[in-house]
């Protein structure tokens, strides 16, 4: 779980996505691989970072060079300085391990719905910083395309966790899959609800991101196939999102703490 070493709770009131790094995540992945496991599942989400996974990549031997040919470890604030990426030094043991990455959003790397614009503000970025971070990720995308021979910037989920989704594909050869779908498959959810009358689920806030494949909608989509009723108890929700949730298979939404609204 990347949030355990690169998550928002760890920085508290010191949020700055220009400086935070995923280096520790890479160290953990490498340590797990060296322990002899055959499969590693990396959970994305709740990160304080916006470095596109460059820190994690550097921790396993990937090298980044600036325009002067100097090697450095990029952070969110310096991804714009990346000129070249060298994958040849990556730890060979990672090629012997299956790495699966779970994420619950389908955002692209950059742009209006990308990592920086959608998630930057919650990591401490103001409007100007969001634009700076987005340009950095855009440059990283260019460098990745040059390094691996294909453009992955529009692959759903590459914008997850400060574009860590893109880094997992490009630097670790991982595949991305929806976290909620993985969990539901693991617990045999479809069988579990076969004789249920109601399915009660919940989320902190039902918002636009929820509608892009998080827990509530993931469950609703499965339940809809069996004509099951889904009740969502959420911390808060806007009326527009509630209406869309109904369209996507949710039977009823009950916010326990509705935000004040004008009449």
Regions found by a protein language model. Give the residues of each.
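N-terminal loops that bind phosphate or other acidic moieties
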Residues: 1-44, 48-263
């Amino acid at each position: 779980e990347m949030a355990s070493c690169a998550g928002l709770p760890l920085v508290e009131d010191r949020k700055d996505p220009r400086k935070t790094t995923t280096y520790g995540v890479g160290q953990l992945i490498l340590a797990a691989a060296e322990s002899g496991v055959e499969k590693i599942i990396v959970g994305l989400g709740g990160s304080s970072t916006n470095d596109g996974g460059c820190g994690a990549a550097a921790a396993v031997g990937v090298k980044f060079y600036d325009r002067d040919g100097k090697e450095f470890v990029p952070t969110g604030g310096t991804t714009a300085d990346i000129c070249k990426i060298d994958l040849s030094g990556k730890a060979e043991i990672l090629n012997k391990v299956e790495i699966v990455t779970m994420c619950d959003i389908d955002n692209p790397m950059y742009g209006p719905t990308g990592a920086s614009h959608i998630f930057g503000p919650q990591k401490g970025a103001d409007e100007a910083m969001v634009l700076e971070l987005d340009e950095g990720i855009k440059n990283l995308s260019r460098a990745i395309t040059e390094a691996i021979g294909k453009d992955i910037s529009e692959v759903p989920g590459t914008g997850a966790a400060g574009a860590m989704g893109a880094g997992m594909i490009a630097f670790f050869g991982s595949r991305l899959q929806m976290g909620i779908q993985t969990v539901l498959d693991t617990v045999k959810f479809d069988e579990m609800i076969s004789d249920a009358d109601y399915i009660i689920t919940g989320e902190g806030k039902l918002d636009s991101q929820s509608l892009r494949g998080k827990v509530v909608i993931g469950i609703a989509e499965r339940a809809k196939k069996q004509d099951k009723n889904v009740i969502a108890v959420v911390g808060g929700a806007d009326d527009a999102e509630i209406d869309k949730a109904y369209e996507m298979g949710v039977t009823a939404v009950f916010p326990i703490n509705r935000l004040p609204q004008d009449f």
